[in-house]
Amino acid sequence: MTQANLSETLFKPRFKHTETSTLVRRFNRGSQPPMQSALDGKNVPHWYRMINRLMWIWRGVDPREILDVQARIVMSDAERTDDDLYDTVIGYRGGNWIYEWAKQAMDWQQKACQEQDAMRSGRYWLHASTLYNIAAYPHLKGDELAEQAQALANRAYEEAAQRLPGSLREMEFAVPGGSPVTAFLHMPKGDGPFPTVLMCGGLDAMQTDYYTLYERYFAPRGIAMLTLDMPSVGFSSKWKLTQDSSLLHQHVLKALPNVPWVDHTRVAAFGFRFGANVAVRLAYLEAPRLKAVACLGPVVHALLSDPQRQSTVPEMYLDVLASRLGMHDASDEALRVELNRYSLKVQGLLGRRCPTPMLSGFWKNDPFSPEEESRLITTSSSDGKLIEIPFNPVYRNFDHALQEITDWINHRLC
C-alpha cells in the first residue's frame, strides 16, 4: 500500500473518536498557574496541550508553520469538549489538533513523493514525520487518532532514513514475559562497530523525535544513536510503565554484544526528562555495561515525591503521567502515592555511590526539575559533572548545552 493510500485509509473523516483531553479522567482538576520550561514549552491560556515551540523548532518546524496550524485550530467553530480550550475539537475534522497537524504532514509527504532529489525528498519525509508526531502529541494511551498519526510518523521516518546520510536499521529486541520492542539504530558514515548512545526520551515524545540530536551532535563525532520508545507508547505500547522503569532499555543494553554495528564496550545513555529516570537507573544496575550517563532536566525524585511541585505542573503533563502508569481514572491522591514509588531516591538508588560517570544539566527555576535534582545525580557519581543552562536566549543555550554534553560523552566513549 502506498504512503498516500495508507493516509487515506487511516484518516477517513469520523466524529465518534474520543477527544484527547477526555482520555484521562482524573478528579480534583485545579486551575493552572502560568508555567514555562525550556524542554516542555509553556501552558498557554485556552490550550489543553503545552505549546512546545523550542523543541518543535529544534526538530525543524518553521515558527510560522506552528502559528498557521494554531490559527486554523483557533478559528474552527466545530463542537469542542471544552469551549474554553481551542484544541478540544471533537472528531477528525477541521479544527481538531490531530487533523490539522496531520493535514500539514500530508502536504510535506506529498512534496516528498514528488521530489526527484533524494536528499531533499528525505528532508521532506523527515519533516512529515515530525509533524505527524506533533499531531499525536501528547501520545495518551487509547487515543486512536493519535495512534494512527504515530503509525504514519514511523512510516515517514523509515522513508526519510533511506534517503538521508548514514544508515538506519530497524531492530527488534526480545523482552522476556512480553512482546518484543522495536528500536532504531542510527549509524554515521564509516565502518563500524561504532561507539553508541542509548537514547532515553521523555514521556511525551517518540523515539523518532530525536533525529536532530543524532544528526547535529552525535554523527559528526562518529557516534551512533540507538532509540527506543518509552513503555506504553509507540513500538513499546504493549508495555506499561512500572517502577522498574528501565526494564526495556536494560534488555536492549544486555543484547548489544550481539549487534555487530555497535561497539558494546563503548556505550553511554542519555536521558531527557523522565528518560533520565531510566538512564540513571541503568547507571546503577548496569554499571559494567555503561561508560557514562548524561541527563537533561531530569525527573528522578522531586516531581515524583513532592505534592506541592506536582500541583504546579500543567494538567496535560499529569495526564501523561497517569496515562503511562495506566491510571486513567485515578484521583490526584492515588496518582501521588504511585508516583512516589518511581523516585530513585525512594527506591534506594540515588544517594548511594555510583561508579558510572554521570552528568546532569539543569535550568534554574525549572518547574519539572530543580537544581537539587541534578546535584543529587552528580554527587552520587564517583565522576559527576553539573551544568547550569541559562534560560535566555533559550535556543542558543540549548544548543551550547547539547554540544557540551556530547563532548563529555565523546570523551568517555573514545
Curated annotation (Swiss-Prot):
Gene3D superfamilies named among the record's database cross-references: alpha/beta hydrolase
Record carries keyword Hydrolase: yes
Domain of life of the source: Bacteria
Major enzyme class: hydrolase
UniProtKB keywords: Hydrolase, Serine esterase
Catalytic activity: a carboxylic ester + H2O = an alcohol + a carboxylate + H(+)
Keyword Hydrolase (UniProt): yes
EC number: 3.1.1.1
A Gene Ontology molecular function term of the record: carboxylesterase activity
Pfam families: FrsA-like (PF06500)
SUPFAM superfamilies, per the entry: alpha/beta-Hydrolases (SSF53474)
Functional note: Catalyzes the hydrolysis of esters.
Entry's family note: Belongs to the FrsA family.
Protein name as it appears in the record: Esterase FrsA
Organism: Salmonella schwarzengrund (strain CVM19633)
